[in-house]
Swiss-Prot record:
It comes from Guillardia theta (Cryptophyte). Binds 16S rRNA, required for the assembly of 30S particles. Its main location: plastid. Belongs to the universal ribosomal protein uS14 family. This is Small ribosomal subunit protein uS14c.
Length: 100
């Protein structure tokens, strides 16, 4: 299981991303529309004033059971360890172990 502090930090990042999403998109569209160099510099400065953790690229996918960030399966929102256990316990319908 991941440290509680890491999970909490990730949750706070998600809140920041949703809080500043509208402002960030407005500034990005302004940046594309403006042609003058000075205006672009002003917009860049405003973008840089947004907190670092408010950008979606700072987010990391985490397993909702353990909080593990590596070995994450997007389809299920689970890490590989939990996915394997749930498949063996028949908790994920339609998922079968492959054999060839």
């Amino acid at each position: 299981m991941a440290k509680k502090s890491m999970i909490e930090r990730e949750r706070k990042r998600e809140e920041l991303v949703s809080k500043y999403e509208k402002k960030r998109l407005e500034l990005k569209s302004k940046l594309k529309k403006t042609a003058e160099y000075e205006e672009k510099l002003e917009v860049y400065k405003k973008i840089q004033e947004i907190p670092r953790n408010a950008f979606p690229s700072r987010l990391r996918n985490r397993c909702w059971v353990t909080g593990r960030s590596r070995g994450y399966y997007r389809d299920f929102g689970l890490s590989r360890h939990v996915l394997r256990e749930m498949v063996h316990d028949c908790l994920l319908p339609g998922v079968t172990k492959s054999s060839w």
